[in-house]
């Protein structure tokens, strides 16, 4: 972006209902406002076409959000769209108001002017594969369902601790479907007192549980109950009766979401570019899945949240977006290296899972982890060091186009360049 081939610079302050747009052509700003609707976006595109005399390639548009309906419409009509981190935009805003004044028209002007004067702070937004868009939505929905599942399980566990802790001896987290079936059939110690061994055998058989027998489970459940105040058991069982259907629903949706992610990853792996000689995305999927420690959820999250760095083979952007690269603050003789907090938190969580898994299945990764732990580094910091190495290896594999082989790991590209 050293020499921008653009004549018109436009800033868009995005809104749920209205978009404030400022264009800078020849140093003179023009402000317009458009509704967030089909008619409003069409009017915005028409206005931009008039400004550039039907040459959309000469228009550069700055906006905070890298995704959305407005961005898709602008890209579809051939405009160049650039995104910026909101924190960086806040710093640029100080140029126009020392007092910190802020409004929509000023933000649109700041975006347009900053893109013209400081293009290196912006990142160009490229059109995305429809499969990547679907995968991103499904992977984010899966993460939300995981959070809901954990929250509901914690609520169930709290209720069981009040009056029926024997169930937690069978499943400490209370997150297994067979435990929910058990509670539907026997919701209280009073009900368990009249339970038969055959009833528990049926539940265990339906859910294929073999680590505990029906006799052992019955013995645990029939142990002396907690002495509780009158009404506690009734209140807790009613609360659990409300939780169980929600837990079953969220668990089914989570399973369906995971299956959908697997299908999308497989479909993406089978996709070939139409133009001969270009890199095929399905090869990238194969290479990613060949890395030790990478499972379906991690692969889907990395492909969805870090698609551009993977396509561009940009190791530095990938480690920065995932929170692996540290932040160094140095002034005079003082030097402080800290964890990076400004990153894609979904991608960072995926890298954390990947790091945990690779330490269990790869001896070299485990040795590197232990080396950092011996230096009194925390578990998370040691995992970031492991993942820094893994991302470098991943990029080397992507550049060479070869699958990862543990005994013949590629050496080219491991110089952090």
Role assignments for model-derived ranges:
Residues 1-417:
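A detector of single, family-specific signature residues
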């Amino acid at each position: 972006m050293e020499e921008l081939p653009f004549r018109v610079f436009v800033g868009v302050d995005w809104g749920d209902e209205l978009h404030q747009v400022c264009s800078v052509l020849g140093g003179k700003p023009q402000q317009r406002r458009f509704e967030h609707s089909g008619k409003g976006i069409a009017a915005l595109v028409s206005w931009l076409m008039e400004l550039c005399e039907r040459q959309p390639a000469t228009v550069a548009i700055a906006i905070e959000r890298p995704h959305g309906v407005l961005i898709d419409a602008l890209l579809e009509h051939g405009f160049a769209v650039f995104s910026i981190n909101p924190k960086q935009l806040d710093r640029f805003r100080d140029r126009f108001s020392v007092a910190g004044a802020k409004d929509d028209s000023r933000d649109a002007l700041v975006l347009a002017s900053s893109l013209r004067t400081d293009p290196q702070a912006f990142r160009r937004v490229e059109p995305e594969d429809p499969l990547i868009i679907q995968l991103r939505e499904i992977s984010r929905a899966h993460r939300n369902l995981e959070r809901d599942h954990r929250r509901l399980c914690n609520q169930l566990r709290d209720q069981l601790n009040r009056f029926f802790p024997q169930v937690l001896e069978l499943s400490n987290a209370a997150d297994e479907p067979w435990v929910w079936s058990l509670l539907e059939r026997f919701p209280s110690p009073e009900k368990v007192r009249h339970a038969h061994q055959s009833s528990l055998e049926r539940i265990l058989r339906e859910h294929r549980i073999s680590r505990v027998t029906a006799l052992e489970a019955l013995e645990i459940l029939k142990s002396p109950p907690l002495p509780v105040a009158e009404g506690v058991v009734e209140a807790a069982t009613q609360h659990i009766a409300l939780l169980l259907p929600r837990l079953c629903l969220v668990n089914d949706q989570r399973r369906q979401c995971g299956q959908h992610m697997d299908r999308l990853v497989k479909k993406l792996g089978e996709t070939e570019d139409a133009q001969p000689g270009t890199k095929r995305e399905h090869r990238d999927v194969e290479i990613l899945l060949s890395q030790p420690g990478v499972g379906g959820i991690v692969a889907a999250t990395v492909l969805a949240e870090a698609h551009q760095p993977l396509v561009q083979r940009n190791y530095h952007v990938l480690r920065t977006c995932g929170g692996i690269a540290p932040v160094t603050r140095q002034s005079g003789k003082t030097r402080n290296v800290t964890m990076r907090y400004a990153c894609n938190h979904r991608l960072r969580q995926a890298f954390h899972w990947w790091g945990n898994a690779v330490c269990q299945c790869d001896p070299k990764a485990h040795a590197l982890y232990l080396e950092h732990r011996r230096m009194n580094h925390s578990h998370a910091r040691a995992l970031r060091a492991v993942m820094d190495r893994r991302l470098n290896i991943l990029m080397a594999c992507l550049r060479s186009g070869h699958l990862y082989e543990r005994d013949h790991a590629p050496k080219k590209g491991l110089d952090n360049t």
